[in-house]
Design a protein with these regions (language model features):
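Short phosphate-binding/catalytic loops that engage adenosine nucleotides
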Residues: 42, 93, 121, 186, ...
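Short acidic, glycine/proline-rich loop/turn micro-motifs
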Residues: 14-19, 160-163, 297-298
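A short acidic/small-residue loop/turn micro-motif
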Residues: 131, 217-219, 288-290
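Active-site nucleotide/adenylate-binding loops and adjacent lid/helix of ATP-dependent enzymes
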Residues: 1-6, 60-64, 104-190, 196, ...
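ATP-binding N-terminal substructure of ATP-dependent carboxylate-amine bond-forming enzymes
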Residues: 1-96, 100-101, 105-107, 111, ...
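ATP-dependent carboxylate activation and anion-phosphoryl transfer catalytic cores
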Residues: 117-120, 244-333
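Phosphate-binding site of ATP-dependent enzymes
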Residues: 170-253, 274-281
Length: 333
């Protein structure tokens, strides 16, 4: 089975404070994934999608892959993560992971929260603020958000735009934080109550099921960009974290509801906070979580290993889940 591996190559240093390509993959990370796919017996061709789109279309036409292992995050626009899956779908090829429509919904954090809230999942109280909003209405909306509050970009992932300075404890400070965030992310920022609790991620792979929850322990109030990308050694992973049976069961139910409500297929990871009272609060859905094997960023593989699945088997599950969804090798001109 011929596999094309689409991705965006990271151009900056892995520990760069610039978050422009924080979601992209290094050559080393892609090479490690490609080696495992080759060990499964599949000829694989990595393709850096950065650059002219016609070049990518021509390359896919030449390869006629049976499946596209898509890790591309996209570079521009509020729905960039959905672009390459949409293109692949329009070319008549199959790709791993969720559909373009599911990716588009999940990248809009405010919309994703409305969807899961409709499925009975608790979400933080908050408001979406855009650069084009009427200032008076924006101030009124922010005034209804409980303090302390956190301000985060609505259309970003990988904790981009989230720092210790994203937390506001009074109304004047909140206005300043929002103004700074809007200047950088004019498409919109989420202003939300800062939910007290511990950060937990729950991964899921078709053919494997829910993974043991991943607990993130660190000094500070939030799992921000610096902790995730600059100093990951300061984060302690607990797989699983120490949760009571009742809380663990509640977490699994909440995670499952979120995956189903958002139409996640193939694989994904939902991020939540467990409150001191044991409630699971939805933070965001990552329908395209990192599959890197690099230490400190390989928590999905570590969680899968708790169930007896090696990285090669995890990647096999990702590919196998994509195969029923369409007809391979029907590339449209």
């Amino acid at each position: 089975m011929r596999v094309a591996l689409t991705y965006n190559e990271k151009r900056t240093a892995s520990a760069s404070p610039d978050d422009a390509d924080a979601e992209f993959d290094s050559r080393e990370a892609i090479a490690a994934i490609a080696r495992l796919i080759a060990e499964l017996g599949h000829p694989i061709t990595p393709i850096d999608v950065s650059g002219p789109i016609p070049r990518l279309v021509d390359e896919l036409a030449r390869l006629t892959p049976d499946v596209v292992l898509n890790l591309a995050e996209g570079e521009r626009g509020t729905f960039r993560e959905a672009f390459y899956p949409a293109l692949i779908e329009q070319l008549g090829l199959v790709h791993t992971g969720s559909s373009a429509s599911a990716l588009a919904v999940c990248l809009d954090k405010a919309l994703a929260k409305r969807v899961v809230a409709g499925a009975g999942v608790r979400v933080p109280r908050g408001r979406l603020i855009r650069a084009t909003d009427d200032p008076r209405l924006a101030r009124s909306a922010m005034a209804r958000v409980p303090l302390p509050a956190i301000v985060k970009p609505n259309f970003e992932g990988s904790s981009k735009g989230i720092t210790a300075a994203s937390i506001a404890r009074d109304r004047a400070g909140l206005a300043d934080v929002v103004a700074d965030a809007i200047a950088r992310y004019p498409h919109g920022v989420l202003v939300e109550e800062l939910v007290d609790g511990i950060d937990v991620g729950v991964g899921w792979f078709a053919g494997i099921g829910l993974l043991p929850p991943i607990g993130y322990r660190y000094d500070g109030e939030i799992y921000d960009y610096a902790l995730k990308h600059l100093t990951p050694e300061r984060v302690q992973l607990e797989i699983p974290p120490p949760l009571s049976v009742a809380v663990a069961r509640r977490l699994a139910v909440t995670a499952t509801r979120a995956f189903v409500a958002l139409g996640i297929t193939g694989y994904g990871r939902v991020d939540l906070r467990i409150t001191p009272q044991g409630d699971a609060v939805f933070l965001e859905m990552n329908p395209l979580p990192s599959l890197t094997l690099a230490a400190g960023h390989d928590e999905l593989y570590v969680a899968a290993a708790r169930l007896g699945h090696a990285p090669r088997g995890v990647l096999a599950a990702v590919i196998d889940a994509a195969l029923p969804r369409g007809q391979p090798r029907q590339l449209c001109a």
